[in-house]
């Protein structure tokens, strides 16, 4: 089993905070194909190359547990490109998407048997876009709203307005998308607690099934980082961060959201009108289902959960990462180099073998972020003893808690989670 990630690095413009690999595409070369067309062709061929190599080594084609189109901005792709991608996924991974996919019949494409997420920018979601989205097997949309303040959106160099974000969600609802995730940011220069509370109120009014909320990060190499270095902006202080995070957790908890990962919240109780295809798929075969939880939200991101719970994943496209069979690999972060390599029928990636210490460290960094924490029985006796020895001072300070054979962060521990994880890792 594996999750499939498709990286679409194209953006109409760059946001000042983004450190992901992205590019603003140019047109075709003369009368030839556009960069988008050649890149999509290459991604389709990469899927075929990977399965051919797996078969040649005696392996089987991966059974997909989720599909995620991320970026960049997947909603910048033409529908012709999107249909080509999904037809290839259907053929390579033997998924039962309906054969009339790509038509504009009223009922649209049949639901995928798994979670299929597509990231969309609000300004791309026109009425026509939402209508045509029905012709794809997408059953979940992740939208980068970030804030409902037009002033802060301009600061981020986002192209949409708050009103456009609200309208986009409405159009997706009308198109039958019953599983919408909204991304928010907090900790903008000069942002007040009251302004953050207003953003939370706005997102709750939208009724999003899933909410991801992150503090604004100043990543080296971004325009935002250069503003920080020049003294033109200041980072949010620790005290305000804690207050904003507390308000986030408390408000969403009171509104019926499960806080299942440090930055992620999923609605626990569907409304009577919910007919999301994702609700009909119960991931009972995934090893990260937790029996001692009463009822995990059906709106948890299954794809992102695979990263946190040691499920293999396949990354397709420039700069995409893959993990599985004791190895981790990453594709070249250059579109032209990526296309050229695939044309020569070679995978443009580097890889590393994951030894026992690295796997332990990965477990600490990912599983500890989740509500369930680290399942101690999955560690060897050596690593379990090592972990619990280092955890003692954090347990005494109330930053970690051992419960039901699991080690997890407390609310206090989340505030200093990075330093705790660093101390628990094996060096």
Annotated model-derived regions:
Residues 1-3, 22-53, 62-98, 109, ...:
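C-terminal scaffold of the Radical SAM
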Residues 382-396:
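Short amphipathic alpha-helical interaction segments
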Residues 395-405:
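A short, conserved structural fragment
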Residues 9-22:
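Local cysteine-cluster metal-coordination motifs and their immediate loop/turn environment
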Residues 406-410:
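Minor-groove-contacting beta-hairpin "wing" of winged helix-turn-helix DNA-binding domains
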Residues 6:
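Conserved N-terminal Rossmann-fold NAD(P)-binding element of oxidoreductases
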Residues 412-427:
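Short, amphipathic alpha-helical interaction segments positioned at domain boundaries
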